[in-house]
């Protein structure tokens, strides 16, 4: 039995009507995962025993007709801590780490009676764009298993795209929800910075990180964001803004909406076939009654350089806690305290993590702070001002998520600069703290291409409204990959 073609609403309706029990759905989910995931490697750890116990309790108590997540299988990226369930951040450093508390978003999932079926693979400590830097295994794209799923939330994207779960959580520091969502043909939302609590998210870049949902449809995504959003006393950066019902505006009507298309997002560095998909999306929005006009974000070209200074500097600080003393990996046969630090970190961290720690430490060091970190902060302000200027006249900004579709496994792993440039279109959104979403827009040589929608701060509702209208008009989301799903 497969439930790939069912969205949250229909799955919930079947559970309420007792066409299927929560236990039957959970067992079918694990059976499907055991069949599909060995080909893809989306998961690092499964949570079968606990999920089946939760499902049995739900069957006994009855499914709440007003709670669309009750009994629904969900996956969680492995940098979000889960009490009693191994959380590794895909690093040897945390290979055997079992948290003693839940992240706030995990508590919200459990309070909604969702079933956490497993933890998904990712780039180590969320540093990467292909899920190839995981210390444990690579994850493969279900549309073409010779290609990457994107990253760093590649496991979550693949779990959803291949029909193993209808909803997964990811995190996005520079594009890590949107880029894999684009590469896998699913919907991924990076909410406004502060919309969702970061308590329990293993920190990479604390001024950039944000947790968000990954789903097959816009409506499911809106419902998932409603569940996890809101202020949290544990996270002082979480906003006290009221969380609206993100599903309320999903009418399909976007007449009169004004959308900006940055000329910098459609330039020479964009694959012509990706550009063609986005141009078709522009026409679709115009057919739906929206106005799309060219705008400019002139300082976005400096985004990648500024981001890798800021994010690496914050990572350098955040990862100091992994020292071989308090918890995590500790090297054997050490001779003294310095040896513990040096060898544990040298052996426990992978190459990409060490590269970013060194870059960040250099940027923060005496004599270089003003030239690099301070200057990057100034560029960040310029990028924020660019967005603010455009949003004086426009409701949304649209463009590609990534310059290309999914690339071949191994093609860019040895070339960090090329890998970093995959995030050139997503990074400015994180630097500005704005919400960004990927919606399936079409295909280039049989590989999914995502449309990026960028909204004003705390205006995810307008993004969902536009994304839903586009999704329903194009029906691209109904196409399924070669591995998993209906295949």
UniProtKB/Swiss-Prot annotation:
Catalytic activities: L-glutamyl-tRNA(Gln) + L-glutamine + ATP + H2O = L-glutaminyl-tRNA(Gln) + L-glutamate + ADP + phosphate + H(+)
Any one biological process term the GO annotation gives: translation
GO MF annotation list: ATP binding; glutaminyl-tRNA synthase (glutamine-hydrolyzing) activity
This protein's GO CC annotations: glutamyl-tRNA(Gln) amidotransferase complex
Enzyme Commission number(s) from the entry: 6.3.5.7
Assembly: Heterotrimer of A, B and C subunits.
Function: Allows the formation of correctly charged Gln-tRNA(Gln) through the transamidation of misacylated Glu-tRNA(Gln) in organisms which lack glutaminyl-tRNA synthetase. The reaction takes place in the presence of glutamine and ATP through an activated gamma-phospho-Glu-tRNA(Gln).
Family: Belongs to the amidase family. GatA subfamily.
Protein known as: Glutamyl-tRNA(Gln) amidotransferase subunit A
Originating organism: Lactiplantibacillus plantarum (strain ATCC BAA-793 / NCIMB 8826 / WCFS1)
Gene: gatA
